[in-house]
């Protein structure tokens, strides 16, 4: 099974793209198509995207999924909501900013999951001389799916916060939910995968989870990567080879890919 995770940074062209003029929509669209074609050549089975922008007349998810021939896909908007009811109302919209998931496998179950993200919007500024400030944190989300491979697999695609201890809480919440999904669907021993921009360095992620790190490679920043904050983790899988990264036409992250069995 080939797994790919990529933070697309809203489809912004980067300096690696010949002739790129940053900020111009037409150029960004061309860069998105080129990046999507590059990933399609890898023939991924599972694709997780972060910082996805879905607007009228423009769909980053569709560009990547259609290029790779992935029929099954899901977008989850990262919108603030004070209640689960309002969150469900917001999720009816297929537009906005969020995360996305696509796969070539049949999907038996799929759901967007809100992760613990609500923080007091009023806080002391980092430079305390300027007192207090108001800022709404991004609502962090995950997409959890059960894939019908030769044996069922539970997959969680996500984009976690940079803040601790919230980051650890979000990862724990996702792992617990995936285990519960497996039990409720009668597949408690099903292998599980978590992939995405986890905003945590490799040495820290190894302390936060019992999942095995399946891909080790520097992913950020895109031009001269010095750290790995994008990860592919698993239970019941092992890496079938070394992880690969690639600088594509969009984003300040590198794409991360690995084969597992």
Where are these regions (language model features)?
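N-terminal, active-site-proximal structural segment of metallo-dependent hydrolase catalytic domains
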Residues: 1-70, 74-96, 168-175
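Structured beta-strand-rich core segments of catalytic domains in phosphoester-bond hydrolases
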Residues: 52-150, 246-247
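Catalytic metal-binding/acid-base residues of hydrolase active sites
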Residues: 9, 52-53, 159-161, 198-201, ...
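Short catalytic-loop micro-motif centered on adjacent basic/acidic residues
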Residues: 46-51, 157, 193-195
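Active-site beta-loop-alpha substructure in enzyme catalytic cores
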Residues: 141-143, 150-180
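Metal-dependent phosphoester-hydrolase catalytic domains
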Residues: 165, 179-193, 198-261
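A short acidic, glycine-rich active-site loop
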Residues: 22-30, 131-136, 217-221
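Short coil/turn segments at beta-strand junctions that form active-site/ligand-binding loops
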Residues: 43, 151-152, 186-191
């Amino acid at each position: 099974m080939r797994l790919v995770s990529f933070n697309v940074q809203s489809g912004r062209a980067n300096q690696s793209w010949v002739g790129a003029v940053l900020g111009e929509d037409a150029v960004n669209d061309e860069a998105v198509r080129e990046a999507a074609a590059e990933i399609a050549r890898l023939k991924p089975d599972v694709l997780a995207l972060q910082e996805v922008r879905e607007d009228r007349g423009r769909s980053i998810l569709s560009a990547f999924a259609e290029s790779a021939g992935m029929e099954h896909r899901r977008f989850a908007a990262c919108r603030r909501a004070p209640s689960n009811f309002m969150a469900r109302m917001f999720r009816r919209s297929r537009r906005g900013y969020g995360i996305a998931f696509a796969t070539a496998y049949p999907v038996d179950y799929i759901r967007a999951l809100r992760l613990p993200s609500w923080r007091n919007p009023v806080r002391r500024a980092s430079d305390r001389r300027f007192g207090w400030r108001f800022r709404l944190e991004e609502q962090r989300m995950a997409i959890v799916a059960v894939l019908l491979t030769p044996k069922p697999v539970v997959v969680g695609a996500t984009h976690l916060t940079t803040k601790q201890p919230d980051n650890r809480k979000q990862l724990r919440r996702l792992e617990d939910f995936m285990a519960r999904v497996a039990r409720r669907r009668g597949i408690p021993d099903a292998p599980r995968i978590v992939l995405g921009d986890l905003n945590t360095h490799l040495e820290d992620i190894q302390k936060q989870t019992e999942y095995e790190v399946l891909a080790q490679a520097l992913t950020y920043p895109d031009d001269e990567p010095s750290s790995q904050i994008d990860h592919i983790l698993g239970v019941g899988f092992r890496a079938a080879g070394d992880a690969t990264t690639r600088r594509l036409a969009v984003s300040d992250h590198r794409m991360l890919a690995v084969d597992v069995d």
